[in-house]
């Protein structure tokens, strides 16, 4: 009895000239290898491998052999591209990650490097997809590379990515600084008055410390200034005048006191202090006179 997992169909159009013996091929099925020798088959007929699980394929294999005696060929697979060559190949059945209920498996055919020179025209990798006869949706051929790992980045790429990240960080910081500058209130520029404007303003301030609205408008028009500029200048000038006036008043009061002392007219607040000083001076002079008199009397007594 043949293996339940495999069945080979012979094409009715096979000729005796295209027969080539196949060598023993190794089959790797989920870590289990079986070596089987196949009889001579026609290259025009397509060799098929139906992959499945024992619980699904046992029934399928028995039905297939029974139907083979009554019917010639019900399902015909596509022919291989090279029909006139003998292939010595290893069939590898990759371990599928699909659940047992899945009925389709991908088979990848990789020709050996030691084959005949005519195999150079054949593609390097032939992929075929076999599915169970019960499935109604055909599937395409797909071969996935074994190496799914990511390639390591070169130092140049790492440096380039780090440089782009630093540039993005610097641009973000610059944008933040610009936003903070925009949000902050701009500082007003200080008005620079000319000498002629200052002279006119000083002359007006000497006559009037406070301006009326009409007079302020006239001065602003004459001096080519705004009313706000004239108003602010007069406010600052009044504050300065008050500070100078306070200092001048103190200096004038001190000068006046000195003049009064020189003239002999003292202020009532200074009389008490000056009187006490004069009395102290007179007392000292009297004490000195008494001491002198006592000295003279003692000298006369010794004589």
Curated annotation (Swiss-Prot):
Stretches the record annotates as Disordered: 63-191, 279-303
Stretches of the chain forming a coiled coil according to its record: none
Free-text tissue specificity from the UniProt record: Aorta and heart. Also detected in lung and kidney.
GO MF: DNA-binding transcription activator activity, RNA polymerase II-specific; DNA-binding transcription factor activity; DNA-binding transcription factor activity, RNA polymerase II-specific; RNA polymerase II cis-regulatory region sequence-specific DNA binding; sequence-specific DNA binding; sequence-specific double-stranded DNA binding
PROSITE patterns from the UniProt entry: HOMEOBOX_1 (PS00027), HOMEOBOX_2 (PS50071)
One annotated Gene Ontology cellular component of this protein: nuclear speck
GO BP annotation list: angiogenesis; fibroblast proliferation; limb development; myofibroblast differentiation; negative regulation of cell migration involved in sprouting angiogenesis; positive regulation of transcription by RNA polymerase II; regulation of transcription by RNA polymerase II; roof of mouth development
Bias (Basic and acidic residues): 157-170, 182-191, 289-303
Organism: Rattus norvegicus (Rat)
Subunit text: Interacts with RNF10. Interacts with TCF15.
Bilayer-crossing regions: none
DNA-binding region: 186-245
UniProt name for this protein: Homeobox protein MOX-2
Induction of synthesis: Rapidly and transiently down-regulated during the transition from G0 to G1 induced by mitogen stimulation.
Compartments, as annotated in UniProt: Nucleus; Nucleus speckle
Free-text note regarding domains: The polyhistidine repeat may act as a targeting signal to nuclear speckles.
Keywords: Activator, Developmental protein, DNA-binding, Homeobox, Nucleus, Transcription, Transcription regulation
CDD domains found in the cross-reference section: homeodomain
Compositionally biased residues, Basic residues: 63-81
Biased composition annotated in UniProt, kind: Low complexity: 111-136
Main localization category: nucleus
